[in-house]
Swiss-Prot record:
Keywords: Cytoplasm, RNA-binding
A single GO cellular-component term on record: cytosol
Biological source species: Shewanella oneidensis (strain ATCC 700550 / JCM 31522 / CIP 106686 / LMG 19005 / NCIMB 14063 / MR-1)
Protein name listed in UniProt: SsrA-binding protein
UniProt GO molecular function: RNA binding
Places the protein is found: Cytoplasm
Any one biological process term the GO annotation gives: trans-translation
Encoding gene, per UniProt annotation: smpB
């Protein structure tokens, strides 16, 4: 007899910031936890998250994520006022925070959330990238490289079918 698992496996990736890889060149990526309220976790489980136009800033030795929209559910908490765009505190070690602060202040880096995902089924984590904004010519070079890869794959596939 087959035993049924009562818990559903949630998909690993919750949301991705697709514009981030287009707008920024990342030199380093790291994982950070999020400090969330109960209604936010329920909304995240339903996939009501938007990471576009989101960024991280440092204030008083702590990291906060600004611009992450979590749309509250209608059935969520009735006794708490749900603010969909409130600041979310990132949970990082002191060493990581000091490293980020140094690079942002001295070298002009930006900290951008790349994706949000589940870790071990219960913890919401954010992958943040440390990078600099791309110029227009960088974006054009990336587009040309991507188009060349597609064309190269097309030619290789055509050659395989002939030979």
């Amino acid at each position: 007899m087959v035993k049924k698992n009562s818990k559903k496996a949630a998909p690993a990736t919750i949301a991705r910031n697709k514009r981030a890889t287009f707008e920024y060149r990342f030199e380093e990526k790291m994982e950070a936890g999020l400090s969330l309220m109960g209604w936010e976790v329920k909304s995240i489980r339903m996939g009501k998250v938007n990471l576009s136009d989101c960024y991280v800033f440092l204030k008083n030795g702590e990291a906060f994520m600004h611009g992450c929209t979590i749309i509250p559910l209608n059935t969520a908490s009735t006794h708490v006022v749900c603010d969909p765009i409130r600041l979310k505190k990132l949970l990082l070690s002191r060493k990581e925070l000091d490293k980020l602060a140094g690079l942002v202040e001295r070298q002009g880096y930006s900290i951008i959330p790349i994706s949000m995902y589940w870790r071990k089924g219960a913890w919401v984590k954010v992958e943040i990238g440390l990078g600099k904004g791309k110029k227009d010519h960088d974006k054009r070079e990336d587009t040309k490289a991507r188009e060349w890869e597609v064309e190269k794959a097309r030619v290789m596939k055509k050659e395989k079918t002939r030979g």
